[in-house]
Amino acid sequence: MNNYDLSLSHSDIGSNRHLNDTKNSSGWSEIDEWGPEKVLQVYDPDTGMKGVLVIDNTSTGPGKGGIRFAESVTPAEVFKLARTMTWKCASAGLPFGGAKGGIIANPNKVNQVEWMKSFAKMIRPYCPSQYIAATDVGTTELDMAVFAHEIGDMRACTGKPQELGGIPHELGTTGYGVSVALRTTLDFLKDIKRKGLEASRPLLDLTNSLDKKSNEIKVVIQGFGNVGSFTAKFLNDLDLKVVGVSDVSGFVYDENGLDIPQLMRDMSDKSKLSDLTSGNNQQKQQQHHNQHRYSYDILEKDEIFKVDSDIFIPAALTGVINDNTAPSLLKNNVKIIVEGANIPTTPSADQYLVDNNVLIIPDFLANSGGVIGSFVEYQGRTEKEAFDLIEYKITNNVKRALYNSISSRDQEDDTLKLNVRKVAMETAKQIVYRAMLLRKGAISV
């Protein structure tokens, strides 16, 4: 990096900003040198639709991010998700920036098609030149079909049905990426021992604690929707032992390992885990399991934080790893967290876990399979090419972040301090900084 000034001011990057109520009734005010460039809050009196679009940073390309459809949507949440997309796309080396959309309602209690049409109509001037949508919580490939038709441009979103040239997220691209991130992390730990890499004592202890057969490594997954269920499937393919999964309704656990293919078949016509038939006791559960049938005991959903496991994968909503749950994970021997969800860990919980030698693979690295697949769809390429590119990019990005974390460690401090999020974030920021400077007309950066 040369002596070109990288400390950009708001006037440097915000000349085209169209901010609508960036400090709302909830007191939210989030503007920094990175963005957001635009915050749109929209309302349609005919349908009652209320929505939010945050275009955070487009220096590397049009803003990319899904449309979340939920009662809990707030401008602050949408901004945080948009910012995560900025780092995610930069880390993955994609020609996209960061953005996110949100519709504020329970999709089961409104006319989802009409509300999606209304939202698309309201933000049409920005699609696809500044914003390219995708699915998220509460939206599916059919919503993307509606969105694209209303915008009048198939390039306005990804995750469309295959009949429209899409690569639906329902194929499991995000979950596959999470499994690749975990596999790469486990391979990295093996390399430490095999290659004799210099590492701190806690990191060596972590390596030794996971030096066992794949089917002896215990994994729990919080969330069993699209991301969580496919993560479980692909981890099962790697012969890892998934001992528990949860959703909003409950927690299914078997210390001997769940039959994931059977569980996915049993869930094919159900909307939540509590719809499964509960067994009376563990003996009955094991008996049915031996007969290739399964009877499930449904525990309280928060019990997932209280069971012994090696690896914890949050694959649902934001903020589930917090000051209350992080100590429970540590108490129950969690050694690695792979963030399948966006922003699942609060900053204070993240610091607490890192300080206590838990290795965290951050969301913008681990769950980038979805947006990588979106990029392949945007280029008009195939499903196979999507999975191949996810494999290639996430393997290399996670490996680079892990090795850079070792090299950045204070050699005088024999503690783990393997803060992958911090190291990977710095890399992403450098990429975005360079793009911002080039947009300003910098000749040498």
Residue ranges and their predicted role:
Residues 80, 131-135, 156-159, 244-247, ...:
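General beta-strand structural signal in soluble alpha/beta enzymes
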Residues 92-94, 129-135, 191-218, 409-425, ...:
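Flexible, glycine/charged-enriched surface loops at secondary-structure junctions
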Residues 1-172, 179:
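N-terminal ligand-binding/catalytic initiation module
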Residues 73-77, 110-114, 118, 138-142, ...:
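Conserved active-site and cofactor/substrate-binding residues in soluble primary-metabolism enzymes
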Residues 298-309, 319-337:
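Rossmann-fold NAD(P) dinucleotide-binding segment
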Residues 169-308:
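Glycine-rich phosphate/diphosphate-binding loop of Rossmann-like nucleotide-binding domains
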Residues 68, 185-186, 315, 328-445:
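Adenosine-phosphate binding glycine-rich loop
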